[in-house]
Amino acid sequence: MPIPEPKPGDLIEIFRPMYSHWAIYVGDGYVIHLAPPSEIPGAGAASIMSALTDKAIVKKELLRDVAGKDKYQVNNKHDKEYTPLPLNKIIQRAEELVGQEVLYRLTSENCEHFVNELRYGVPRSDQVRDAVKVATVTGVGLAALGLIGVMLSRNKKQKQ
């Protein structure tokens, strides 16, 4: 099935190994996105190193160059929850930011936060939220296992 042609203002999710990179489509094949120093076209797994930097550059590049060999899709997943800002405002703000160096934090100011703020006026990252949930569930599970282990150990000692 062919990938639907993105429209200006659409959020583009690019499937990198181990995470998704996000951009906003601005027309004529171009996207605007946050590019930490290692986020080069087709970077793949190497771009996970972007987690180690606190700065990013807002870049306007061809979608095909940013995606490289990775698959991508239009993903305006929050349209039911938030009303997108007017298209001219989305594009104008995105274009004004091109070339600027901005703060980059994996957990609070990443590429997904960036594009959601442009489209909806709300910076949010489901990848970060989901990772926190997994870490919390894992931590609670490990704590429960530890508690069970201590209780079984005490019970065994009491029987001896």
Curated annotation (Swiss-Prot):
Effect of C111S: Abolishes enzyme activity
Upregulation: Induced during preadipocyte differentiation into adipocytes.
Keyword flag Endoplasmic reticulum: yes
EC numbers: 2.3.1.-, 3.1.1.32, 3.1.1.4
Transmembrane residue ranges: 132-152
Active site (catalytic residues): H21, H33, C111
Residue ranges, Cytoplasmic side: 1-131
The record's note on its domains: The C-terminal transmembrane domain is required for the targeting of the protein to damaged organelles.
Protein's name in the database: Phospholipase A and acyltransferase 3
Organism: Rattus norvegicus
Species lineage: Eukaryota, Metazoa, Chordata, Craniata, Vertebrata
